[in-house]
Amino acid sequence: MSLLFVFNRIGFILYTGYYKHALKNPIFDEIIKTLFNGARYDNRVVSSLAILFIIIGLLGLFAPKHQIKMLNITAYFSIAIILFLNIANIVYYGIYGNVFDENLLEFLHEDTLTILKMSTEYPIFSSFSLFVILSVLISFIYFKLQNALFKPNVYQTTKPLKTFILFALFSLTQMFYINAQLSFVGASLDLSIEPAKDPFLMKITPGAFRNLYLLVRNYRQSHNLKFSDFAKETPLEVAKNYFNLKENPQNNLYELLTQTSRNNSNQTIQHVFYIVSESLSSWHFDPKFDAIGLTSALQDLAKKEHAHMLSAFIESAPRTVKSLDVQITGLPYINDNNLVNSGVILPSFPMAIGNITKTLGYKNNFYYGGSGIWNKLTSFTKKQGFHALYFNNHLLEFAKNKPYPKPIESNWGVHDNILFDYILENTNPNEKTFSMVMTLSNHAIKNVNLKAFGVPLEKIQQFVEKTPKSENLPDANSLGHIYWYDKVIVSFIKKASQKFPNSLFIITGDHFDRSYEYAKNDLYTIKSVPLILYSPTLKPKKISQVGSHLDIAPTIIELIAPEGFPFVSFGKPLFSNNTTNPPSHPNYALGYEAIATKDYFYNPSLGLRYLNESPKEPEDKQNDKKQNDKKQNDKKQNDKIEASKFYQQLESLKALSYYLLYHGANLKD
């Protein structure tokens, strides 16, 4: 069965890759890598079919006369399903230019006449005929081999040792096939493999079964959702309340979200670097860590004349994939299901930062040190306006023969120092570029050679040991990686600023750093990530003290687009070059399961968490303590009422986001 999968993939490469010219870079080593990586995915299917074969064989013991027939039917079914799905995947690629994805759902809902018309343009009938012929031929070969290799044993005796050896070999093979490695722990192939660089080879690596499984799973999960799961009102009523309109809106959602740049600066920004840092959190900047200089470089950067750091910034999603969904598309968080796995055809969103910067004439590059297959990053970023994706294969080739401290990668991908060096070399100084970067070295397993980079591990270890155990600090290795990244990213910013002076840098975290166990009881700590803005040539005005990931894209556009440029966004600019008439900001932010103002964070379950110990209220020395306490309590009650209203806005935002994804921009009841 494993060989059948291999031959299917070879056929895919020969027919679609070479004959149909889908293969852009026919490098032999890359093809071998694709066959090897694809086999790791396919072997899991083979293992499942082997288990099915054994179960049928055991059931056949209750009907010995029919056991052979039952096993033969199972074998034929296995051959047929493997051939059918793989041939169908090849035909599908010829129609849609991709392996099985959400377009398959539309194809299955097409009327018979449409499919018949498609069959005249695409080889649907001929491929089905090929499937029938190959099924019969391969089944015939299989049964001939079976009869030749497994002749009936006339003596009907079985040696226990031989049985044990066969069982052990079978078990080891199953373990290797299922876990994709000789281990009792399964490997996440989407994360661990290094795919081929060629887009076609990358797409076909996981295989038809894997793609179909993801499609069915995600379709079932996503289509259990209803608008009523997010709001009691109708979509029009929700939009009316969210946008504070007097009556139900007549226009579509994109029109309601349209805003214009007020940038009146003559300074042109040639390069934008939007850096999403793995697990970079506000708690990293806590003064308690200043003794070890945990984020000293970023803190020094934020104090520069041309830099700003927001005092309150809230995450928009709880994990990397979902955070990237929000920051790449501009679509607010709906639920924990990845957008590429939402079971619908994703549009190219007009509020996607890549689509907006593309309109402004920027060359859009996405950089990630991990696999390009992860989260379908290649097709996802391309759909949302990026011209190119650079991932682990590019970085490994770049790092070859360079004296980087080993190891240069973790199980997630290539380390951030190499990523930043590659960006410096890959950025064209003669064209406008927008570079979105996702780092990864601060993700477990954290294996940077910290000593080789001069990280003071002994000092950090002493700091951890002196800190009360009740605070449950991260270990020295985790803190060391935060320290290391802080110095690496600022080093990159300094080098990039010199090489590309007309640049804008945005630094944020994807989500709260969960390595700080003790902090999980604190609402601000678990929801807050930093936002640092720096440009050597700009002195923008800060519009708001609070923001979320949704506000980053409109902030960038406000700073780089010409005055009057229209764009779509759920967020609002946080900074502007227009110091006299900047755009407005509501001065509250809607994040992941929480809202934020400059004074507090709020979640219905955890309540108010003030950024200072108590709400700010000037003390009246002439009033006694009881009166002051009453004022404080009244202030808290008013804040809670206000926060509840803001949280209702968050619920409405999720409802509108759901509606936009599943029903489009035209609002209807």
Please report, for each region that a protein language model flagged, where it lies by residue.
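Transmembrane and membrane-interface helices of multi-pass
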Residues: 1-225
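Alpha-helix initiation and N-capping motif
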Residues: 4, 101, 112, 206-209, ...
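A general boundary/transition motif marking the beginning of the first structured unit of a protein
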Residues: 27, 103, 196-204, 227, ...
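Residues that form generic nucleotide/phosphate-binding pockets
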Residues: 38, 42, 118, 144, ...
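Short alpha-helical "patches" and their helix-cap loops
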Residues: 69, 224-234, 340-345, 570-572
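Membrane/wall-proximal cationic-aromatic binding patches
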Residues: 121, 125, 192-199, 205-275, ...
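Solvent-exposed soluble domains appended to multi-pass membrane proteins
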Residues: 244-625, 634-669
